[in-house]
Amino acid sequence: ALLMASDIPVFTGVGGGLTKGHRVVNLAMYAEMQGAMGVVVNVPTSGLVISRMRRTIDIPIVVTVANHGTDYARRIDDGAAIFNVAAGSATAEIVAEIRAQYPDIPIIATGGPSDESILRTIDAGANAITYTPPSSAELFKHTMERYRMGLPYE
């Protein structure tokens, strides 16, 4: 339903953590058939599964990186077209590490909790930032705090 309703490209998570093996390949194939622009796999996804996906689908495979111990060359050889860096406070450092070794590979990264961390990640070489905006409850909390102090909403 999301793929049908979206007016922007959708990258679909297909597993690699709890969902493993041939099921990940099947989900990737199904996502491609439904119109996904790319598929995303989690850190534990084996190289064998990534290479099977590469032989099965034509859309980009986004491989998640969460620590310095990742063999980037191996992941690229397996079929990674894009890296998704989600390494918490080490994200910008890992983005810079990847960018230094592979200047042309696209990198998507989590930006972190602040404008400063997002800018550090961009400066490190990320091509795109994923961001989770505050929920309506978080936004409304600020409004209610102002109301309780007798202040107008700003």
Which residue ranges define each predicted feature?
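A glycine-rich, hydrophobic loop/mini-helix early in the fold
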Residues: 4-33
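Eukaryote-skewed repeat-based solenoidal scaffolds used as protein-protein interaction platforms
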Residues: 29, 48-62, 67-81
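C-terminal helical cap(s) of enzyme catalytic domains, especially alpha/beta-barrels
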Residues: 52-56, 97-98, 119-123, 133-154
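Catalytic cores of alpha/beta
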Residues: 22-30, 70-78, 113-131
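Short beta-strand/loop segments at the ligand-binding rim of alpha/beta enzyme cores
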Residues: 5-15, 54-64, 99-110
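Glycine-rich phosphate-binding active-site loops on the catalytic face of alpha/beta enzymes
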Residues: 35-45, 81-94, 124-145
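Surface-exposed amphipathic alpha-helices with a cationic face
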Residues: 3-4, 32, 50-58, 76, ...
